[in-house]
Amino acid sequence: MYPAVVLLLLLLVEQAAALGEPQLCYILDAILFLYGIILTLLYCRLKIQVRKATVASYEKPDGIYTGLSTRNQETYETLKHEKPPQ
């Protein structure tokens, strides 16, 4: 909206009519460049706010591994081979 207002003001001023084609293109390029930067900043700000709201609303009451405990046994135990009684 602001770039459109600036463009209209430039066109209404008498000096704007005195500008040649290249200068007018440079002005329009600068306006579009600023417009792109503003939109990018607003988009990034919106994404950050949504991410913060999502993280804040996510509550982790219990973890996935809450009820599990570590094993007291080793992973590889030696086998005790007993001879059968004779």
UniProtKB/Swiss-Prot annotation:
Residues 54-82 form the ITAM domain. Keywords: Cell membrane, Disulfide bond, IgE-binding protein, Immunity, Innate immunity, Membrane, Phosphoprotein, Receptor, Signal, Transmembrane, Transmembrane helix. The modification Phosphotyrosine is found at residues 65, 76. It is a single-pass type I membrane protein. GO terms for biological process: antigen processing and presentation of exogenous peptide antigen via MHC class I; antigen processing and presentation of exogenous peptide antigen via MHC class II; cellular response to low-density lipoprotein particle stimulus; defense response to bacterium; Fc receptor mediated stimulatory signaling pathway; Fc-gamma receptor signaling pathway; immunoglobulin mediated immune response; innate immune response. The modification Phosphoserine is found at residue 69. Residues 45-86 are cytoplasmic. GO terms for molecular function: IgE binding; IgE receptor activity; IgG binding. Its main location: membrane. It is found in: Cell membrane. The chain crosses the membrane at residues 24-44. Residues 19-23 are extracellular. It comes from the Eukaryota. The modification Phosphothreonine is found at residue 78. InterPro entries: CD3_zeta/IgE_Fc_rcpt_gamma, FCER1G, Phos_immunorcpt_sig_ITAM. GO terms for cellular component: external side of plasma membrane; Fc-epsilon receptor I complex. Residues 1-18 form the signal peptide. IgE Fc receptor is a tetramer of an alpha chain, a beta chain, and two disulfide linked gamma chains. Associates with FCGR1A; forms a functional signaling complex. The signaling subunit of immunoglobulin gamma (IgG) Fc receptor complex. As a homodimer or a heterodimer of CD247 and FCER1G, associates with the ligand binding subunit FCGR3A to form a functional receptor complex. Associates with CLEC6A. Interacts with CLEC4E. Interacts (via ITAM domain) with SYK (via SH2 domains); activates SYK, enabling integrin-mediated activation of neutrophils and macrophages. Adapter protein containing an immunoreceptor tyrosine-based activation motif (ITAM) that transduces activation signals from various immunoreceptors. As a component of the high-affinity immunoglobulin E (IgE) receptor, mediates allergic inflammatory signaling in mast cells. As a constitutive component of interleukin-3 receptor complex, selectively mediates interleukin 4/IL4 production by basophils priming T-cells toward effector T-helper 2 subset. Associates with pattern recognition receptors CLEC4D and CLEC4E to form a functional signaling complex in myeloid cells. PANTHER family: HIGH AFFINITY IMMUNOGLOBULIN EPSILON RECEPTOR GAMMA-SUBUNIT, HIGH AFFINITY IMMUNOGLOBULIN EPSILON RECEPTOR SUBUNIT GAMMA. Belongs to the CD3Z/FCER1G family. This is High affinity immunoglobulin epsilon receptor subunit gamma. It comes from Cavia porcellus.
